[in-house]
A protein has these predicted regions:
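Short, well-structured N-terminal submotif of metal-dependent ribonuclease cores
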Residues: 1-37, 46-64, 123
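Generic enzyme active-site microenvironment
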Residues: 5, 106-107
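Alpha-helix capping/helix-boundary segments
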Residues: 10-11, 41, 73, 93-94, ...
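Acidic, metal-associated active-site segment
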Residues: 45, 88-104
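Short, polar loop motifs at secondary-structure junctions
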Residues: 50, 107-112
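Acidic catalytic patch
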Residues: 63-84
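Short loop/helix-cap segments at secondary-structure boundaries that form the rim of catalytic
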Residues: 111-119
């Protein structure tokens, strides 16, 4: 695995000090693996940077890629939502980012992601 992509649930688990997620982030750093965070997922999870030190640290650390929802990705997200008859822009953006990076998704809600992208490898926390 080249790295992992976080959805909002994975980020919230990190913020809540979930030991599995902390270990995964530490292992990724030790092995030089990339961590991808779609900006849409960050927007769902971030509420108070000063009170969310683990999350704030993750987005600043080397090896973390924060991916904006730009024009091409917005189009890919819209096409994916149309193809799957779903409406969650954030989950679709996570799927687009994870597929492009060839990464598994750290999530707490596998059902929603499986509806949008059944082919993705999911790490459920």
């Amino acid at each position: 695995m080249s790295g992992v992509t976080f959805d909002a649930g994975g980020l919230i688990a990190l913020d809540r000090n979930d030991r599995r997620v902390l270990a995964l982030v530490a292992r990724a750093a030790e092995r030089g693996m990339r961590i991808t965070i779609p900006a849409t997922a960050l927007a769902q999870a971030m509420r108070s940077p000063a009170r969310q030190p683990r999350l704030s640290r993750l987005i600043r650390q080397a090896g973390t890629d924060l991916i904006a929802l730009n024009g091409p990705d917005a189009t890919a997200v819209g096409l994916l939502l149309a193809r799957t008859a779903t409406a969650d822009v954030v989950d679709a953006h996570v799927a687009v980012c994870a597929r492009r990076a060839g990464e598994a998704v750290v999530t707490s809600d596998a059902a929603d992601l499986r509806r949008i992208a059944p082919d993705l490898k999911l790490l459920v926390v």
